[in-house]
Regions:
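Acidic, Ser/Thr-rich intrinsically disordered and amphipathic helical segments
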Residues: 44, 83, 98, 112-116, ...
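GT-A fold catalytic core of metal-dependent nucleotide-sugar glycosyltransferases
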Residues: 2, 180-254
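Catalytic core and acceptor-binding pocket of nucleotide-sugar-dependent glycosyltransferases
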Residues: 4, 43-47, 247-315
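Active-site-proximal specificity loops/subdomain of glycosyltransferases
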Residues: 112, 137-195
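Beta-strand elements of modular eukaryotic interaction domains
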Residues: 86-90, 125-126, 134-135, 190, ...
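Short amphipathic alpha-helices and their capping/turn residues within compact interaction modules
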Residues: 122, 126, 139, 152, ...
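Short coil/turn segments at secondary-structure boundaries
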Residues: 113-116, 135, 148-152, 159-162, ...
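Juxtamembrane luminal stem/stalk of type II transmembrane Golgi/ER carbohydrate-processing enzymes
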Residues: 1-114, 119, 126-132, 149-153, ...
Length: 315
């Protein structure tokens, strides 16, 4: 009887199984979900790897991608707001330093001293690499046109001036045209600092025999050549020559140039050029107050007409 009951029970179960569809067990469900998740993970990973070859930012999570798309403008270089800023950006070294030479029609005439200035960069020791960082700052149209046809192209900038007649010709020392040219140059240099660019200003009648940058003092705001050097680079008793000046852009130098340019009108005799005014204000309490750090360059290395270097090996 036991065998019969067992057979009946088994037969009955088989019949039910044949009539009713079996439901998957919990273990089977987990296996299916695991396969689906694995397939999805592999597919997404392949897509990310493929896209990252063209855009590495695609490996970021969706919310980070969304944040980046909303803020991507902060990662783009800022477009220049003016023609001057465009020229500065194109000519600047990695540390935002430019070399500036002021030009007018007389300075850039064919076979002029300016041609020798450019040639000195080619033949000087370690100087040719700096030619691409030189900006010809022109005060009249003819100087600008000639600048564009020389090695400086495209780093030429035309100052917006309404008095070309006084600025473009041969201006003898201390004539009204000379003084106007000097102070127009000073205002331009102040503007360069305000835009955040360091500069090395060089008169166009200076010949670059060697790379001057190793001679500059580190961590100094303002460095200037001397007509007469007393042997102490920190002494304000040195008599300066503003035709070769290295300045780093910061709040101290911007304030100093504003003070320097504004001081032209502080004195009864306004027929003063920038060097005379500098020598009058260099001990002013305001200069100490802003904390600008100055150094005066040895004429052994940076020679001038008043005190030419006696060492041809080092000048």
């Amino acid at each position: 009887m036991k065998n019969t009951s067992s057979e009946l029970s088994s037969s009955s179960t088989d019949d039910r199984d044949g009539d009713i569809t079996k439901l998957p067990s919990n273990g089977s469900q987990r296996d299916v979900m695991t396969l689906v998740l694995l397939f999805t993970t592999v597919t997404v990973s392949c897509i990310l790897v493929y896209n990252s070859s063209n855009n590495p930012l695609m490996v970021l999570s969706p919310w980070k991608l969304n944040w980046f798309s909303q803020n991507k403008t902060s990662f783009k270089p800022r477009e220049p707001a003016s023609e001057l800023e465009r020229v500065l950006m194109n000519a600047a070294m990695e540390d935002k330093t430019v070399i500036i030479a002021a030009l007018n029609e007389a300075w850039v005439a064919p076979n002029s001293i300016f041609d020798l200035f450019l040639e000195s960069f080619h033949v000087g020791i370690g100087t040719e690499k700096y030619l691409k960082h030189v900006i010809g700052v022109c005060v009249d149209d003819k100087a600008y046109e000639r600048c564009l046809h020389l090695h400086l192209h495209p780093h030429c900038y035309l100052i917006n001036a309404t008095d070309y007649d006084q600025l473009s010709g041969k201006n003898n020392y201390m004539t009204p045209g000379y003084l106007k040219l000097i102070w127009r140059r000073m205002e331009f240099l102040r503007e360069v600092l305000a835009l955040g660019y360091n500069f090395l200003f060089t008169d166009a009648d200076i010949l670059w025999f060697r790379d001057p940058f190793p001679r500059f003092f580190p961590d100094v705001d303002f460095q200037i050549a001397c007509d007469h050097y007393n042997g102490n680079s920190s002494s304000k008793r040195n008599w300066v020559n503003s035709g070769f000046t290295y300045v780093k852009a910061n709040n101290k130098t911007i304030k100093f140039y504003e003070f320097w340019c504004g001081s032209r009108y502080r004195f009864h005799d306004r027929r003063k050029h920038d060097q005379e005014v500098f020598n009058l204000i260099k001990r002013d309490p305001f200069v100490d107050q802003i904390g600008i750090k100055m150094r005066f360059l040895d004429t052994l290395h940076i020679g001038t007409f008043c005190e030419p270097s006696k060492d041809v090996i080092n000048v």
